[in-house]
């Protein structure tokens, strides 16, 4: 019983620590380009050969920076648009590209296709269902086995029977605690997946072909790097054209 009390104390202390931890919010603002403020957002735009991009930082979701982006196809030809046409390049305070820890590669992150995220979430939810089913089987076997051992040792007064009863009782207690942990983790994970699934399913900035003189607006999600002081959002709509580039300053602010 002592180790169970110790386990509960650890969990309670962890919860208190997590509640007391100061949270910080990642902030970004455009630099180097003229911007306008609309609805509290700093908006920047560029146009080249009939293609116009309007962008603003819209917050953070999980490990991603979210940009509210609208792409206008003001040409007379169809234009294929994809979140993967966007890249995010983290930079240091001198606006030099950050590199991997070994210094070999320049860091850069590609935009996320919502459909791929939705497929991943569905796969992960299925994996979690299978995992909890396996855990239930293991827990049931442990509890039933422990109870049978307790019954078998009941009424016997030998030292061996006493030890068997002690082990069986411990096994049952372990299985009960494990069952609680398994179900807590399962529901927590499934809740997070459901919330993420709702976010991704509502995003309409997906790979599509824009007809001439139409536009598409939505959230573009790109992974961030906490070491960055600046970051450049690039949009490459044609291999024959220079990409659009928007420079943002990045910092963290305590909430």
PLM features per residue range, with description:
Residues 69-78:
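Asparagine-centered strand-capping/turn motif at beta-strand->loop junctions
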Residues 13-36, 54:
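Bacterial Sec signal peptide processing site at the extreme N-terminus
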Residues 61-68:
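Short, solvent-exposed loop/turn segments enriched in Ser/Thr/Gly
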Residues 100-201, 214:
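Hydrophobic alpha-helical membrane segments
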Residues 1-19:
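Sec-dependent bacterial lipoprotein signal peptides
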Residues 211-220:
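Short Pro-Gly-centered flexible turn/kink motifs
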Residues 77-85, 188, 230-234:
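Short, hydrophobic/aromatic beta-strand segments
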Residues 226-255:
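Terminal connector regions
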